[in-house]
């Protein structure tokens, strides 16, 4: 569990938890997220068990979750992540073809599925788009 780019003054920005067992992929995702104003990496996890613990502790806006991880896969961790961080939006980013696993991932509670190899722009736009969509859905309820 390595924390990166934690800045409590950035409460207005979108906090992102990066979960991937490959250190080089986590580093790449940290760079991708960090390149955009309004996004920051709140933390990192290297397996499903760490992902659950960090989701509980950090309560991020968005979790980027790999499927193939040791100790507990992303798919196994997903229901517990949604339980401990119910407001978090989950983007599964995996090397598996979308045609093979996307339906299962979305049925398990993920909000979006992207294949690894997606462009940095698509990854950032997916994260921001999810949060904007969620904000629009919640705003009428808050006005009450």
What positions do the PLM features span?
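Active-site beta3 strand of CheY-like receiver
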Residues: 58-64
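Conserved acidic segment of CheY-like receiver
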Residues: 12-33
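Acidic catalytic/metal-coordinating carboxylates
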Residues: 47-50, 73-76
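Alpha4 helix (beta4-alpha4-beta5 surface) of REC/receiver domains from two-component response regulators
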Residues: 76, 97-114, 118-121, 125, ...
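Non-catalytic signal-transmission and effector/linker regions of two-component phosphorelay proteins
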Residues: 1-15, 124-144
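Conserved sequence signature across two-component system core domains
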Residues: 19-20, 45, 63
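Receiver (REC) domain active-site loop signature in two-component systems and cognate sites
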Residues: 69
């Amino acid at each position: 569990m390595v924390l990166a780019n934690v800045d409590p003054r950035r409460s207005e920005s979108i906090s992102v938890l990066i979960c991937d067992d490959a250190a080089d992929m986590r580093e790449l995702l940290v760079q991708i997220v960090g390149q955009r104003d309004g996004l920051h990496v709140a933390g990192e996890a290297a397996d499903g068990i760490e992902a659950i613990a960090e989701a509980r502790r950090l309560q991020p806006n968005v979790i980027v979750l790999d499927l193939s991880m040791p100790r507990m896969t992303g798919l196994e961790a997903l229901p517990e992540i949604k339980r401990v961080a119910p407001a978090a939006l989950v983007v599964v980013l995996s090397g598996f073809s979308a045609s093979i696993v996307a339906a299962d991932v979305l049925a398990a509670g993920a909000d979006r599925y992207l294949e690894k190899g997606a462009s940095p722009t698509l990854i950032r736009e997916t994260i921001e788009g999810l949060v904007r969509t969620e904000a629009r859905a919640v705003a009428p309820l808050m006005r009450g």
